């Protein structure tokens, strides 16, 4: 199986980046951060992201999701709306909120390249950072990588079973929301799929968009043969 390493065009149009992910974290990450802050704990630490068992009793997994992790880290900052919401929870002190206002990630990220075959208990992403920063990014990194590795792995297994025949990704309508469907399409191409039905994923990630036609097309003609013939006239290739 040939896995693909797909990078974002850094100047490209990432529609999903309009959804700010700073608060995509578990509350206890924030309360622990404040605890570290109050106790003057900001030692440089190492957090490793790994998994314990292969999905679906398989023998391997495929690494995916790194590019979205990078984008998340680069854009990580607390704006006035974030600070106001955290203040409304009445569990964070003003000195800690002032710290968050100027927050920027200053650590280092080490990672296995996307498309690499991976195995249980080996680090996929290593975060080396002050403990408050490493704690904050834990949840989002796991959320992104767990989902996309799962999709890339499933795609790789399907492509292997196809024994050289082309496989396309067509999962948008059954995905758990727009971001899952779109980043899942990218992960499926990393796993070996030839392209996706998802037009937004094609625009965002410059991957081939593919498709057939629906049964509604066939039903709009008097018989199946006519429906196929008319579609073939429009799209002979």
Task: Describe the residue ranges of each PLM region.
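N-terminal, Lys/Arg-enriched amphipathic/low-complexity engagement segments
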Residues: 45-101
């Amino acid at each position: 199986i040939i896995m693909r390493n797909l990078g974002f065009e850094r100047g490209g149009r990432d529609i999903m980046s309009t959804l700010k992910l700073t608060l995509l974290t578990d509350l206890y990450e924030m309360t622990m951060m404040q605890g570290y802050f109050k106790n003057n704990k900001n030692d440089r630490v190492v957090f490793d992201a790994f998994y314990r068992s292969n999905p679906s009793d398989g023998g391997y997994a495929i690494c995916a999701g790194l590019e979205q992790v990078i984008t998340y880290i680069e854009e990580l900052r607390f704006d006035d709306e974030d600070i106001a919401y955290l203040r409304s929870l009445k569990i964070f002190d003003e000195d800690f909120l002032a710290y968050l206002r100027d927050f920027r990630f200053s650590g280092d990220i080490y990672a296995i390249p996307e498309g690499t075959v991976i195995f249980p208990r080996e680090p996929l992403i290593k975060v080396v950072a002050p403990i408050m920063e490493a704690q904050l990014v834990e949840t989002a990194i796991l959320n992104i990588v767990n989902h996309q590795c799962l999709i890339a792995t499933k795609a790789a297994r399907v492509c292997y079973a196809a024994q050289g025949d082309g496989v396309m990704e067509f999962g948008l309508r059954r995905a758990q929301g727009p971001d899952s469907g779109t980043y899942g399409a990218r992960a499926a191409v990393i796993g070996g799929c030839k392209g996706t039905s998802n037009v937004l994923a094609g625009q965002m990630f410059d991957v081939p968009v593919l498709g057939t036609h629906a049964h509604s097309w066939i039903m709009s003609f008097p018989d199946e043969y006519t429906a196929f013939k008319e579609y073939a006239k429009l799209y002979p290739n």
